[in-house]
From Swiss-Prot:
Taxonomic source organism: Shewanella baltica (strain OS223)
Residue ranges the record marks as coiled coil: none
Gene name as annotated: tatB
UniProt protein name: Sec-independent protein translocase protein TatB
Keyword entries, A-Z: Cell inner membrane, Cell membrane, Membrane, Protein transport, Translocation, Transmembrane, Transmembrane helix, Transport
InterPro entries reported for this sequence: TatA/B/E, TatB
Amino acid sequence: MFDGIGFMELLLIGVLGLVVLGPERLPVAVRSITSWIRAMKRMANSVKEELEQELKIEQLHADLKKAESKGLSNLSPELKESIEQLKQAAQSVNRPYQVQDPVKDTPAPENQIHSPVASTVQTSPAQASQANPTATVEASPTSASPATPSEPSQGADTRSNPKANG
């Protein structure tokens, strides 16, 4: 990493950094500089990988053009292999963009769920309330009252209540 810098130069840079930044800020500065260097290395590696991939694609295209000019019948094994790779790469690129028909892809429902309400016998409202006592629910005064400020309701945000924070 430090090809042109010797030990004495590194020591001098360290002493100057200690004098200029002080012992409190020097470790923070070193960490931030190392994170910048790591980010630049990552970026350089990603650019390098992209360039290599583009060059490989260009080589495959050149091989394909060469194969087309020769005719597809008498190809060398290397050219056949590169054509197959190119076809696979084209298919992998096209897969995410293919539109799938959701109506075609979903299977037909085999078991349909029928509503129990539709299958019940029609009765008058008076008969229904006698048959099902839980059908009418009256609001009780305790369930309608809001929570007091000293007792936050369950799941309430404690940041809005200063007593809960400290």
